[in-house]
C-alpha cells in the first residue's frame, strides 16, 4: 500500500494553510525533527565571501547606544533627523540601544552620527 509522492503532493496542494501548518507540526513531533532552516550552518561556508561583502557594504544603520548626560538635546536631534513626534523620539532615546535610521548611505550615516554625538549621544554605525 505504497502511496506515490505525486498523490501526497496533490493532497497537500488541496489543503488549507492551517491544515498544512498542523501537518508540519505533527510531522515534527512524530519524527523528532524541526522544519526550521539551518541558517547558522550555511554562514561558516561563506566566510571568505563575507569579508569581500563587508568591503562593499552600501547600506548602514545608525544605532543610539546611549543618550549620555544631555537627554533633552539628544531627543531634539533625533526629532530633527527622523521627523518623529516628541513622545516617539523620547521613547526611542530612552529605549537605547535602538536604531535611529536604517538602510542609509555611508555619508548620511556619518552626518547623523556627527549630529547626535554633538548633542551628547553615543552612536554606533553598523
Curated annotation (Swiss-Prot):
The keyword RNA-binding does not apply. GO terms for cellular component: cytosolic large ribosomal subunit. Homodimer. Part of the ribosomal stalk of the 50S ribosomal subunit. Forms a multimeric L10(L12)X complex, where L10 forms an elongated spine to which 2 to 4 L12 dimers bind in a sequential fashion. Binds GTP-bound translation factors. One of its GO terms (molecular function) is structural constituent of ribosome. Forms part of the ribosomal stalk which helps the ribosome interact with GTP-bound translation factors. Is thus essential for accurate translation. Gene3D superfamilies: 3.30.1390.10, Single helix bin. Pfam families: Ribosomal_L12, Ribosomal_L12_N. The keyword Ribosomal protein applies. GO terms for biological process: translation. Keywords: Ribonucleoprotein, Ribosomal protein. This is Large ribosomal subunit protein bL12. InterPro entries: Ribosomal_bL12, Ribosomal_bL12_C, Ribosomal_bL12_C/ClpS-like, Ribosomal_bL12_oligo, Ribosomal_bL12_oligo_N_sf. Belongs to the bacterial ribosomal protein bL12 family. SUPFAM superfamilies: ClpS-like, Ribosomal protein L7/12, oligomerisation (N-terminal) domain. Signal peptide: none annotated.
Amino acid at each position: 500500500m505504497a502511496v506515490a509522492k505525486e498523490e501526497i503532493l496533490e493532497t497537500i496542494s488541496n489543503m488549507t494553510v492551517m491544515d498544512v501548518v498542523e501537518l508540519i507540526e505533527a510531522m515534527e513531533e512524530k519524527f523528532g525533527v524541526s522544519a526550521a532552516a539551518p541558517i547558522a550552518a550555511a554562514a561558516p561556508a561563506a566566510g571568505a565571501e563575507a569579508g569581500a561583502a563587508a568591503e562593499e557594504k552600501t547600506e548602514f544603520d545608525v544605532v543610539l547606544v546611549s543618550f549620555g548626560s544631555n537627554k533633552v538635546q539628544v531627543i531634539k536631534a533625533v526629532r530633527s533627523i527622523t521627523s518623529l513626534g516628541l513622545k516617539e523620539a523620547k521613547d526611542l532615546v530612552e529605549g537605547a540601544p535602538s536604531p535611529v535610521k536604517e538602510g542609509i548611505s555611508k555619508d548620511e550615516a556619518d552626518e547623523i552620527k556627527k549630529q547626535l554625538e554633538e548633542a551628547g549621544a553615543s552612536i554606533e554605525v553598523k
